[in-house]
C-alpha cells in the first residue's frame, strides 16, 4: 500500500525520553542520548491526551504523518500500550530468516529499503511456528497452514488489518487477503478477556521460563473503531495483559510472543542518516539491530500510508 507522495514522519520526543529513562534493556546510554538528540532536532513535545468520556489509559501522541497524529503511547500498570490510526498507517507482517524462513516474501527479515521512509514502529510477532499454536501465510505462500477458530491477525490487500477468529469472523467475505498470522485462541473477544486467562495459564497461553505466570508478554488488539493497539510488559499474567487491552477499548486481541528474549517494541526517529529505533517497553532485552538488521523471527512493522 503506497501513496504517490509520502508526508514526513515525525516522532514526538517527550514520551521517548520518559520511556528510555525508564530503562530499556540493551540500549546503551550513548545510544539513548544519540536517539533523543536526533529526535529533539525535529519535533516538539505534546500534551497529555485523554479520550473524552472513556476510562482507561492516558494517551500521548508519539508519531504524526505531516500534522496529523498517527500513533499514541500509554504506560499503565506495568503495560506499555501503542495505539495506531489505520486511516494513516498500515501493518506489515515480516517473515524472519528462520521463522518461517525461505525466500520470496514481500516483507523479509529486516525493515527493508522500501520501508525506511515510512516506518513508525515495529514489534515482535507470535510464538515459534514449531510450537504448533498457529499459522503463517503471506503473499499467497503458506508457511504453516491456518487453523479454523484460532486468533488471527489478518491484513488485507487494501492495507487494512482486522483481528478475529479464523473463519469465525475473519477474513471479510470478498476482500483479498495479503497476510495472516495466527497465535492461540483470542485473548480478548467482544471486549472481554478469554475465560481461561486465570486458570489455564501455561497450557492455554504458553510455556514460560521457570514456569511462572507473570513473565514478559505481548499482544495485538483492535478497537471498535478499528484502531490497532499493541501491548507489552515484562511482568504480566495473561489476565493482566487482557485487562490492559480491554481498558484501552480493545474488542478483539491475539496474544503474541512471551518470555523476555522475544518481547520488543520500537518507535523510529527519522534523521538524515536513516531511522533509529527507540525501545518503548521499560526493561525489554531488545533485538540486536532493532529490526533494521536481519532477524530470525517474524515481526510486524507499522508504516505510513
Locate the predicted segments by residue.
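Bacterial N-terminal signal peptides that target proteins for export
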Residues: 1-11
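Active-site signature of cysteine proteases
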Residues: 232-275
Amino acid at each position: 500500500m503506497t501513496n504517490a507522495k509520502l508526508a514526513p514522519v515525525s516522532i514526538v520526543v517527550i514520551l521517548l525520553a520518559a520511556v528510555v529513562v525508564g530503562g530499556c534493556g540493551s540500549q546503551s546510554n550513548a545510544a539513548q542520548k544519540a536517539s533523543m538528540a536526533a529526535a529533539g532536532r525535529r519535533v516538539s513535545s505534546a500534551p497529555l491526551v485523554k479520550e473524552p468520556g472513556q476510562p482507561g489509559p492516558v494517551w500521548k501522541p508519539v508519531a504524526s504523518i505531516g500534522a496529523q497524529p498517527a500513533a499514541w503511547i500509554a504506560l499503565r500498570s506495568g503495560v506499555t500500550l501503542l495505539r495506531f490510526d489505520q486511516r494513516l498507517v498500515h501493518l506489515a507482517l515480516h517473515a524472519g530468516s528462520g521463522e518461517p524462513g525461505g525466500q520470496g516474501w514481500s516483507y523479509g527479515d529486516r525493515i527493508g529499503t522500501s520501508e525506511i521512509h515510512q516506518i513508525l514502529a515495529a514489534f515482535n510477532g507470535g510464538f515459534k511456528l514449531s510450537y504448533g499454536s498457529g499459522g503463517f501465510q503471506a503473499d499467497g505462500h503458506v508457511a504453516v497452514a491456518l487453523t479454523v477458530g484460532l486468533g488471527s491477525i489478518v491484513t488485507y490487500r487494501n492495507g487494512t488489518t482486522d483481528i478475529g477468529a479464523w473463519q469465525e469472523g475473519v477474513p471479510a467475505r470478498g476482500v483479498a487477503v495479503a497476510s495472516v498470522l495466527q497465535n492461540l485462541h483470542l485473548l480478548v473477544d467482544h471486549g472481554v478477556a478469554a475465560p481461561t486467562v486465570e486458570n489455564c495459564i501455561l497450557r492455554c497461553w504458553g510455556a514460560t521460563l521457570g514456569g511462572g505466570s507473570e513473565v514478559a508478554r505481548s499482544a495485538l488488539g483492535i478497537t471498535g473503531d478499528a484502531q490497532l493497539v499493541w501491548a507489552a510488559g515484562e511482568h504480566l499474567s495473561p489476565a493482566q495483559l487482557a485487562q490492559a487491552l480491554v481498558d484501552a477499548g480493545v474488542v478483539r486481541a491475539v496474544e503474541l510472543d512471551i518470555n523476555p528474549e522475544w518481547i520488543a517494541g520500537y518507535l523510529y526517529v527519522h534523521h538524515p542518516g536513516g531511522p533509529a529505533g527507540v525501545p518503548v517497553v521499560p526493561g525489554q532485552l531488545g533485538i540486536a539491530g532493532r529490526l533494521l538488521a536481519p532477524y530470525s523471527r517474524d515481526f510486524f512493522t507499522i508504516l505510513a500510508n
